[in-house]
Amino acid sequence: MTASQRTLMVMAGGTGGHVFPGLAVAHRMEAAGWRVVWLGNPAGMEATLVPKHGIPMEYVRFGGLRGKGLKTKLTLPFNLLRACGQSLAALRRVRPDVVLGMGGYITFPAGVMTALSGRPLVLHEQNSIAGLTNKVLAKFAKRVLVAFPGALPHAEWTGNPIRAELAGTEAPKARYAARSGPLNVLVVGGSLGAAALNEVVPRALAMLTPGERPRIVHQAGAKHIEALKANYEAAGFAAGEDVRLVPFIDDMAAAYAAADLVICRSGAMTVSEIAAVGVAALFVPFPYAVDDHQTSNAAFLADAGAAVLVQQRDLSAELLADWLRGQSRASLADMAERSRSLAKPEATDEVARVCAKAAGANLETLQ
């Protein structure tokens, strides 16, 4: 670190939905010459993932209360006090010019201590329904940013920071016009899989005639791939050129861009990535998400005719088969264009600019 180099502290952890957008901003700031330090939980995924990106870590131990037992709730005051002390110590060691909160349990004690220490705090809410931590911290933050309009009062709509390759894909109109033959459908269950999709999609395909069936790429998560293969075999399909079953996908930008339709859950980053690429989507929100935020995330696109939203309780093989019969590449291309029009491809740069400005930096350092 040089005497003139400014420092950004990113506080985020727990899930990829918090960590990956934080990493996108961190790398953008590093490219502009900033020093970046990450504040996370030693038990979270960030403790393993972030150091692989060459970013130094500071740690705070703090967990959530939802669904926890009486013992956890009784020890909350002690754990919160300890986390506040750890947060203050980290802030004193790092001495950041600005702190960016991207979500996760540790954001609460660290955000409180950031505000009390007089350092500028920038918050970013990834979901369409803000969590309790950000609702509280928004009262003390210098700038409040949201991925979906209306998630927090008096906030700036920047979108979700995403990987550059997702924002740089060819326009939907050109991609769809270049294709012929069966529709290309990508089914994404995520790293944990989505049992409802894994069961319903094969049965829906079996209800279609050979001429109606799309080509399928179905990602199920490593723990669910064998069960997925069994589901397709039970429906009369063997993995081959028209049915590809995979545990994970390395290049999601290419997978999204090659699809005419994506069938998936509606986590914040998934919705943002689909809009950035511009691809039609059928969202099946995870029914047990906190505050049912996945339904609200999906509705952002669905209400604009840019996607279709089906609740898991309503999803059936019959419904999916009937809906697929009614789709054409042209209708899906129209949906994809609407989706792309709602994207915020400059989100990473915009969040970085806000952080720089909050620290009193010249925005020309983020060219």
Curated annotation (Swiss-Prot):
Entry-linked Pfam families: Glyco_tran_28_C (PF04101), Glyco_transf_28 (PF03033)
Enzyme type, top EC level: transferase
Reactions it catalyzes: di-trans,octa-cis-undecaprenyl diphospho-N-acetyl-alpha-D-muramoyl-L-alanyl-D-glutamyl-meso-2,6-diaminopimeloyl-D-alanyl-D-alanine + UDP-N-acetyl-alpha-D-glucosamine = di-trans,octa-cis-undecaprenyl diphospho-[N-acetyl-alpha-D-glucosaminyl-(1->4)]-N-acetyl-alpha-D-muramoyl-L-alanyl-D-glutamyl-meso-2,6-diaminopimeloyl-D-alanyl-D-alanine + UDP + H(+)
Pathway entry: Cell wall biogenesis; peptidoglycan biosynthesis
GO terms for biological process, alphabetical: carbohydrate metabolic process; cell division; cell wall organization; lipid glycosylation; peptidoglycan biosynthetic process; regulation of cell shape
Major localization class: membrane
Localization (cell): Cell inner membrane
SUPFAM superfamilies in UniProt: UDP-Glycosyltransferase/glycogen phosphorylase (SSF53756)
Protein name (database record): UDP-N-acetylglucosamine--N-acetylmuramyl-(pentapeptide) pyrophosphoryl-undecaprenol N-acetylglucosamine transferase
Originating organism: Burkholderia lata (strain ATCC 17760 / DSM 23089 / LMG 22485 / NCIMB 9086 / R18194 / 383)
Lineage: Bacteria, Pseudomonadati, Pseudomonadota, Betaproteobacteria, Burkholderiales
